[in-house]
Amino acid sequence: MIKLEHANISATDVEAMTRFITTAIPSFRIRHEGLDTGGRPWRHVGNDDFYIAVSTVSERGNRKPYSNVSGLNHLGWEVDDVAALERRMVEAGYSVNLKAHEHPARRRTYFYDPDGNDWEFVQYLSDDPAQRNDYSDAS
């Protein structure tokens, strides 16, 4: 068995990043927090099975997702209701960065977090792996 236990994100504002994460994923909570050896705050935001470690950095990087520079392009999260997530995020002041075109087996929306990292949220409309994994519409 293998599963992703956590991810670690560097953030210029731990509070702002925590708000973004818990707005997008309301079941997540602050599991633990403290100060690193330099006295900067860090947090584990998640549930009993998975968390995102949020570490403080002093400046935002200049890498942009999909910019032909190596690095992470986006995090993809499966959700039950993309429309509800989108409403919740917009009501909290976040802007949709990309709303993917309609697909018969899925709905997707994307948001940038406060430090410019891209987050994808996908709702599958089918349990059939062939339909879920059909990317014939990808450009």
Regions found by a protein language model. Name each.
Residues 53-55, 120:
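Conserved beta-strand in the GNAT
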Residues 1-18, 73-75, 127-139:
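N-terminal beta-strand motif that seeds the catalytic metal site of vicinal oxygen chelate
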Residues 8-51:
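Core segments of cupin and vicinal oxygen chelate
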Residues 17-20, 85-89:
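Hydrophobic side chains in well-ordered alpha-helices
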Residues 4-12, 31, 43-46, 63-139, ...:
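Vicinal oxygen chelate
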Residues 56-60, 124:
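Acetyl-CoA-dependent GNAT
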